[in-house]
Amino acid sequence: MTFIFQLALFALVALSFLLVVGVPVAFAAPEGWNVTKGYVFQGVSAWFALVFTVGVLNSLVA
């Protein structure tokens, strides 16, 4: 169970880093927002899901 928690936490940190870099790039590109809007929303949705998953796994591990 600890390994699954660590894997989910790593995925959360990696996705957070990708969103911190990717969202400003999507906003800065001239037509990038219209093209990448779906990817940004999918990334944010996955981020919220990972936050709740890590929270649940943390309560099970601790």
Swiss-Prot record:
Superkingdom of origin: Eukaryota
> Does the keyword field hold Plastid?
yes
The transmembrane residues are 8-28, 41-61
Localization per Swiss-Prot or TrEMBL:
Plastid, Chloroplast thylakoid membrane
Which Pfam families is this protein grouped with?
A: Ycf9
The record ties this protein, via InterPro entries, to: PSII_PsbZ (IPR002644), PSII_PsbZ_sf (IPR036512)
What keywords does the record list, in alphabetical order? Chloroplast, Membrane, Photosynthesis, Photosystem II, Plastid, Reaction center, Thylakoid, Transmembrane, Transmembrane helix
Q: Gene Ontology cellular component?
A: chloroplast thylakoid membrane; photosystem II reaction center
Topology versus the membrane, per the UniProt entry? Answer: Multi-pass membrane protein
The protein's matches in Gene3D superfamilies, at most eight in alphabetical order, are given as: Photosystem II PsbZ, reaction centre
Q: Which GO terms describe its biological process?
A: photosynthesis; photosystem II stabilization
Describe its function.
May control the interaction of photosystem II (PSII) cores with the light-harvesting antenna, regulates electron flow through the 2 photosystem reaction centers. PSII is a light-driven water plastoquinone oxidoreductase, using light energy to abstract electrons from H(2)O, generating a proton gradient subsequently used for ATP formation.
Relate the assembly described in the record. PSII is composed of 1 copy each of membrane proteins PsbA, PsbB, PsbC, PsbD, PsbE, PsbF, PsbH, PsbI, PsbJ, PsbK, PsbL, PsbM, PsbT, PsbY, PsbZ, Psb30/Ycf12, at least 3 peripheral proteins of the oxygen-evolving complex and a large number of cofactors. It forms dimeric complexes.
Similarity comment: family membership: Belongs to the PsbZ family.
Listed name of the protein: Photosystem II reaction center protein Z
Name the gene. psbZ
